Amino acid sequence: MEQLTTLLEKSVAQIGKLASWLSLFIVIIIVADVFMRYTFSITSSASFEIEWHLFGALFLLASGWALQEDKHVRVDVFYQKFSTKTKAWVNLFGSLILLLPFCYVGFIEGLQFTITSYQIGETSPDPGGLPARFVIKSMIPIGMLLLGLQGIAIILKSIKAILVND
């Protein structure tokens, strides 16, 4: 169980850390876009679209890592006062009842969304926009998978924490 948890968490963290570099590219593209717009009055649908595509990929690919690092939004009013075992129970049931079903539905629907986009050859509706819209849409099932894998790691860690005698 420990090896599986470690494997899941290392995989999610590596992908999250790699995805975090997308923020640098987003900043560079936005700065270049603003410079071109205000200096030369040149705008591009493709540059605007790549900005939000990269942001979407960053958000989806790093969400599992954010959960691993406990950086997701949480209402800590009660949680912070709980014992380690009570926190483990909350994490276990929260992951089983809320997180994994959400990831499952997001994965299945996102996969169908991506497949349909690929099958119809979906491109940007904007002139000069990006082709192959299925590429960004594929980030949805991938992101849901990563978030779900981290959820499984949390479940395993919670079970271990519950079973350990204080």
Predicted regions and their residues:
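Alpha-helical transmembrane segments and membrane-interface helix-loop junctions
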Residues: 1-166
